Amino acid sequence: MAALRSWVTRSVCSLFRYRQRFPVLANSKKRCFSELIKPWHKTVLTGFGMTLCAVPIAQKSEPQSLSNEALMRRAVSLVTDSTSTFLSQTTYALIEAITEYTKAVYTLVSLYRQYTSLLGKMNSQEEDEVWQVIIGARVEMTSKQQEYLKLETTWMTAVGLSEMAAEAAYQTGADQASITARNHIQLVKSQVQEVRQLSQKAETKLAEAQTKELHQKAQEVSDEGADQEEEAYLRED
């Protein structure tokens, strides 16, 4: 046992003396070992990061939103929104077109009234000039009328699409979308009806002005005939 202790003591002392004699070699071994394990640490860390990136993130599932009924309600809501937008745009265009037509009608009414008030006070040249203005206004009115009639056809198509979308929303259980679409349809119909009534009122005034102009002209011709007959009668006397 004493011999074993003596051998251990000598070995430790020899190792200590060895490290004191060759410190550079010992440090070199440490550096070599350190350099050896550095890439391994980097590799492990990089691989661990890549592993984390590759793990998919679980998303919360929404079983109710994936049902066929829910998907249909969502789709029909988008349809009602789209048809309502289309209806709004066509309604705006139609109202603007009817308003422009109504203005053109009132312009023609004013010209007819002025012409009627000047009957018998104009020479033939002045009368021709007034008639040229009236003809130009009539052409403008006809052009505006054709434009609004064309838009009216598109507007009626938009109304039909909105009504079908509202019905589809009702059938699929999207009650709120159906109610909103139907209320919107009623609103635009009332707006168009209001401007239509204004245009119809203008057309009535135009018809009255034209009738008055015809009566006035007929009266003027009759008066001229009576004057000629009276003049001829006086000549005979």
UniProtKB/Swiss-Prot annotation:
Ubiquitinated by BIRC7/livin. Ubiquitinated by BIRC6. The precursor form is proteolytically cleaved by mitochondrial processing peptidase MPP to remove the transit peptide and produce an intermediate form. This is then processed by PARL to produce the mature cleaved form which is released from mitochondria into the cytosol in apoptotic cells. It comes from the Eukaryota. A motif (IAP-binding) lies at residues 54-58. The lineage of its organism: Eukaryota, Metazoa, Chordata, Craniata, Vertebrata. Residues 221-231 have a biased composition (Acidic residues). The mature N-terminus mediates interaction with XIAP/BIRC4. Residues 1-33 form a transit peptide. GO terms for biological process: intrinsic apoptotic signaling pathway; intrinsic apoptotic signaling pathway in response to oxidative stress; neuron apoptotic process; positive regulation of apoptotic process. It is found in: Mitochondrion; Cytoplasm, Cytosol. The record marks 53-54 as: Cleavage. Promotes apoptosis by activating caspases in the cytochrome c/Apaf-1/caspase-9 pathway. Acts by opposing the inhibitory activity of inhibitor of apoptosis proteins (IAP). Inhibits the activity of BIRC6/BRUCE by inhibiting its binding to caspases. This is Diablo IAP-binding mitochondrial protein. Belongs to the Smac/DIABLO protein family. Residues 206-237 are annotated as: Disordered.
